[in-house]
């Protein structure tokens, strides 16, 4: 790997995936991927250098990730299993086990204390007497959730982040470089997809794309980095550039306008995509058409809105107007791009 490759992958993650859309929100899936990616970094560092400090840092970041989201325990468990596998093959097994589990236990005590204060019991992470939709049901077909998470027109991962389609090629390229990491990422990917695919709310309500799979995105881009470093033909670079531009445009639609209001409309109202839902028939007033057809997909509706009745949702657009704001924005991006290009040349 080299600085140019690392910079390219960072740009792809920042601007051509759903992470770009969510970057302007306060959702915990925004910092979450950074934390679990950091734990993966310390895991790989220990694998290569065999230093105890990396075990401690990996354990601490995994524990901290659980404070952000409970479902990050999936990645923490996967990484812990792989660390234990490394411990068993090396010396100082007991010391390594202590370095791994003591920080995790510390964060576990914090989580138990928070649960005790908030829910009255250290073993509860939510209220058990709440009413609402039953998100886990034996009547819900898991294959529907899995296909929906990946390919549905209204919320699919590969629809809203088309650059990730390259993983079907990149897994093989990365496997030749680092088999162990591929197995870890595949394990994480399969587990989280099956977990959220089993929920009737796999779509994340009115989220832009597969919100629950956003933490998986940087790991899939790591796979793509292997293809960038090994495949040098122009056709492949043209394919990557095209998918990146499409992904940027798709997620820019969400950034520049209020999709939640102008596309979905008020909950239970007579306008927007919510108006398609029938109370008592469609859970959460979400008609399946909004997820399974392009005609009623929020993506297509947002695209039509942008070109026919654009409602800017950016502060500068409202103050200066669209044209002056666009000129300033493009100028700033051009200057930053030039400076970054100069820095990369120095590398």
Residue map of PLM features:
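Transmembrane-helix signature of polytopic, membrane-embedded enzymes
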Residues: 1-15, 33-34, 50-57
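Membrane-interface alpha helices of multi-pass inner-membrane proteins
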Residues: 9-14, 54-69, 76-80, 105-106, ...
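Transmembrane alpha-helix segments characteristic
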Residues: 13, 58-62, 101, 105, ...
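Short acidic/glycine- and proline-prone juxtamembrane loop motifs at membrane-interface regions
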Residues: 21-31, 117, 156, 209
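Perimembrane helix-loop-helix junctions
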Residues: 45-48, 74-105, 166-178, 222
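Hydrophobic, aromatic-rich transmembrane alpha-helices
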Residues: 81-85, 158-186, 220-227, 236-245, ...
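Membrane-lumen/periplasm interface segments of specific transmembrane helices
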Residues: 96-170, 185-196, 246-265
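Transmembrane helical bundles and short interhelical boundary loops of multi-pass, membrane-embedded
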Residues: 235-347
């Amino acid at each position: 790997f080299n600085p140019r490759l690392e910079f390219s992958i960072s740009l792809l993650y920042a601007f051509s995936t759903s992470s770009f859309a969510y970057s302007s929100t306060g959702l915990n899936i925004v910092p979450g991927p950074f934390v679990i990616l950091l734990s993966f970094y310390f895991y790989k560092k220990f694998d290569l250098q065999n230093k105890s400090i990396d075990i401690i840092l990996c354990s601490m970041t995994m524990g901290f990730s659980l404070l952000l989201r409970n479902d990050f325990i999936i990645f923490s468990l996967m990484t812990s299993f792989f660390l234990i596998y490394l411990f068993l093959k090396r010396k100082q097994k007991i010391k390594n086990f202590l370095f791994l589990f003591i920080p995790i236990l510390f964060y576990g005590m914090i989580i138990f204390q928070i649960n005790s204060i908030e829910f009255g019991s250290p073993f509860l992470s939510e209220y058990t007497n709440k009413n609402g939709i039953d998100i886990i049901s034996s009547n819900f077909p898991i294959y529907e959730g899995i296909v929906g998470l990946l390919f549905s027109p209204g919320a699919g991962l590969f629809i809203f982040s088309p650059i990730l389609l390259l993983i079907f090629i990149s897994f093989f390229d990365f496997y030749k470089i680092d088999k162990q990491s591929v197995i870890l990422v595949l394990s994480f990917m399969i587990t989280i997809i099956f977990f959220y695919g089993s929920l009737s709310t796999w779509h994340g309500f009115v989220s832009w794309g597969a919100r629950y799979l956003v933490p998986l995105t940087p790991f899939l881009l790591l796979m793509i980095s292997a293809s960038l470093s090994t495949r040098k033909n122009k056709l492949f670079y043209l394919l990557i550039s095209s998918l990146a531009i499409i992904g940027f445009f798709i997620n820019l639609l969400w950034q520049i306008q209020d999709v939640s209001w102008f596309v979905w409309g008020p909950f239970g109202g007579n306008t927007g995509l919510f108006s398609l839902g029938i109370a008592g028939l469609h859970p959460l007033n979400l008609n399946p058409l909004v997820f399974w057809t392009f005609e009623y997909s929020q993506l297509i509706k947002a695209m039509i809105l942008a070109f026919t009745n654009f409602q800017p949702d950016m502060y500068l657009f409202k103050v200066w107007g669209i044209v002056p704001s666009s000129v300033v924005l493009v100028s700033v991006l051009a200057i930053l791009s030039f400076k970054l290009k100069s820095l990369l040349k120095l590398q």
